[in-house]
């Protein structure tokens, strides 16, 4: 299932795929997706909480580590393994701590609590060029508000895939998301 779902997401034009570690057999899924599409996309894991999980993601072929929190040890381990680190942050202090630890970019989470206004305010203290993705609450109907607030991208999770979704369902969701994003 993982390869088929990843394939339709890529076909829609989305080139970053994270497999949540709280899903069934996540490391097997990462490995099979990397084998099929590793040259076409940045593939890795979400909900990464420990340095041991970082090593497992790398062993599965992943190049991307996304966390719901800001753990400097996880960030450092991810960078040491040559992967991209996108920790979850909610406050300016967490954002700056993540960047100091070497984060590639930031996952503003939960985005619906911070809102576009929260992101816009946080930009005042972030180093120029810092990539920030809004996660949790970003959807096609509010992409434009997030972009106006300087979001660089989005993490979409269940907006694009829920367990039990068919490839056709995911393809339709992914295409609608890309169409909405491209319309901005």
At which residue positions do the language-model features occur?
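Conserved N-terminal beta1-alpha1 strand-loop-helix module at the mouth
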Residues: 1-63, 80, 139-141, 162-184
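Catalytic cores of alpha/beta
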Residues: 5, 50-60, 93-101, 124, ...
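Conserved functional loop/turn residues at catalytic and ligand-binding sites
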Residues: 13, 37, 61, 69, ...
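Structural preference for beta-strand elements that scaffold enzyme active sites
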Residues: 16-18, 40-44, 63-64, 84-86, ...
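Glycine-rich beta-to-alpha transition loops that act as phosphate-gripper elements at the mouths
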Residues: 23, 43-51, 67-71, 87-92, ...
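Histidine/lysine/aspartate-rich catalytic loop segments that bind and position anionic ligands
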Residues: 64, 68-114
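Glycine-rich phosphate-binding active-site loops on the catalytic face of alpha/beta enzymes
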Residues: 64, 68-74, 108-115, 149-173
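CoA-thioester-processing core
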Residues: 85, 116-126, 132
């Amino acid at each position: 299932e993982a390869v088929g779902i990843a394939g339709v997401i890529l076909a829609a034009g989305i080139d970053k795929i994270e497999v949540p570690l709280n899903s069934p057999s996540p490391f097997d899924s990462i490995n099979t997706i990397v084998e099929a599409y590793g040259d076409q996309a940045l593939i890795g894991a979400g909900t990464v909480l420990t340095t041991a999980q970082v090593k497992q993601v790398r062993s599965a072929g992943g190049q991307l580590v996304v966390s719901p929190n800001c753990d400097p040890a996880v960030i450092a381990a991810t960078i040491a393994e040559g992967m991209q680190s996108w920790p979850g942050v909610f406050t300016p202090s967490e954002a700056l701590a993540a960047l100091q630890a070497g984060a590639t970019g930031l996952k503003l989470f939960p985005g619906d609590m911070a809102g576009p206004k929260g992101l816009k305010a946080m930009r005042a203290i972030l180093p120029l060029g810092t990539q920030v993705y809004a996660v949790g609450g970003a959807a096609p109907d509010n992409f434009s508000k997030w972009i106006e607030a300087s979001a660089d991208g989005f993490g979409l999770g269940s907006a694009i895939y829920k367990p039990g979704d068919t490839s056709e369902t995911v393809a339709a969701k992914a295409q609608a998301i890309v169409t909405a994003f491209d319309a901005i």
